[in-house]
Amino acid sequence: SAEETPLQSKVTNKVYFDISIGNPVGKVVIGLFGDDVPQTAENFR
């Protein structure tokens, strides 16, 4: 089995979206690595 490498990057921001299928069913939260990919993280803000 392969060993997992711990993350070295820091989540700088979180974005989320709520999911509804007729009624609210949940929320998806995505962590953004702004120090590693600042332009990509900014696109979500």
UniProtKB/Swiss-Prot annotation:
The keyword Plastid applies. Its EC number is 5.2.1.8. It catalyses: [protein]-peptidylproline (omega=180) = [protein]-peptidylproline (omega=0). InterPro entries: Cyclophilin-like_dom_sf. Keywords: Chloroplast, Isomerase, Plastid, Rotamase, Thylakoid. One of its GO terms (molecular function) is peptidyl-prolyl cis-trans isomerase activity. GO terms for cellular component: chloroplast thylakoid lumen. Signal peptide: none annotated. Residues 11-45 form the PPIase cyclophilin-type domain. Its main location: plastid. It is found in: Plastid, Chloroplast thylakoid lumen. The keyword Cytoplasm does not apply. Belongs to the cyclophilin-type PPIase family. Was originally reported as TL18. PPIases accelerate the folding of proteins. It catalyzes the cis-trans isomerization of proline imidic peptide bonds in oligopeptides. This is Peptidyl-prolyl cis-trans isomerase TLP20, chloroplastic. The lineage of its organism: Eukaryota, Viridiplantae, Streptophyta, Embryophyta, Tracheophyta.
